[in-house]
Swiss-Prot record:
Top-level lineage group: Viruses
Family: Belongs to the intercrine beta (chemokine CC) family. Highly divergent.
Protein name: Putative CC-type chemokine U83
Gene Ontology molecular function: any one: chemokine activity
Record key words, sorted: Cytokine, Disulfide bond, Signal
Disulfide links within the chain: 32-62, 33-76
One GO cellular component term noted in the UniProt record for this chain: extracellular space
Length: 97
């Protein structure tokens, strides 16, 4: 009796490895984004929505960079969304409301 495994072909193994790496990359990016929450503790829902939008945008760009085969060290460039720039953005929103 023959027993078959879905992951037995080299292509399936490669796909599984890419999927595992992609998940790790996204988890790493999510952890980077989660660190930003320490910068703005106790903010109201008014601030939470733009904060979440920034996190989602950075996750998408990080994942897109990974898919473009950039080096792992450069795929999570946080320069444009550092805690300082996030704080300034939230401060501006606070003044406008």
């Amino acid at each position: 009796m023959a027993i078959g495994f879905i992951g037995s072909s080299p292509d399936a193994e490669l796909s599984s490895e890419n999927s595992r790496i992609s998940s790790s990359v996204l988890l790493g990016c999510l952890l980077c984004c989660t660190d930003w929450s320490a910068v703005v503790p106790g903010k109201t829902e008014t601030f939470r929505k733009p904060f979440v939008a920034i996190m989602i945008k950075k996750l998408k760009s990080c994942f897109a960079a990974y898919l473009s085969d950039l080096e792992q060290g450069s795929m999570c460039d946080m320069a444009n969304a550092s805690p300082t720039s996030l704080e300034l953005g939230l401060s501006k929103l606070d003044k406008e409301s």
